[in-house]
Amino acid sequence: MNALVKTICTFVTSSIGRKIIVALTGLCLVLFLAGHLAGNLLIFGGPEWINTYAHGPHSMPEAALWGIRAGLGVIFIIHVWLTIQLKLENNAAREPYVFKNTIKATLSSRYMIYTGLTVLVFLVYHLYQYTLRVGYDPAQFTTFISDGTVETFDVYKMIVAGFSNVWCSAFYILAVLMLFSHLRHGVQSIFQTVGVDSRKIRPLYNFVAIAYGAIICLGFISVPVSVLLGIIK
């Protein structure tokens, strides 16, 4: 084993190294969420906007599309796996508190792993419903874009059909609220892990974390709420 490989192995197995990897993979996912939200909000522009956006990735070569999906999947799995590892190690090393009120951690940080696992369960369901499109017959969800010249799957109709189910919308909204709690602590942790942490700047990045989480989550929630209220139909 050469020195470089040994250094890499030492880094990825150390507590600090894994925290940095969690922060970097978390940053990738945070940025992905922003892009995903921007695409989702195109539904307010009407069927043409959202269907054109959704058709874009599917116009790519199949191998390239699944390569991107696989890359995101690997980033997500690494993030979840290392987070659980660090949480379990931290719990094992920490002595139990005699009094609960001595715990100074925020609710977001204390329940980080649970909100994350809730989001994971939701993600599996979300992929099953909207990426694999299980239960949606392509023959009934076909439309045309680009002035009727390109045939594509009707994502607009699929979203309206899905969120017209109150229970589906309720589960989505609950998961997004869990995501807010997760993002609030996660974004704060990214700043801390990369060394941007001082008493002067801490209130600023705490505000950024809360604001970012709120914008992302309110944006996602606006879609099912608008469907249920008949704004999107």
What name fits each language-model region?
Residues M1-K233:
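Membrane-embedded alpha-helical bundles that constitute the cytochrome b-like, heme-associated redox core
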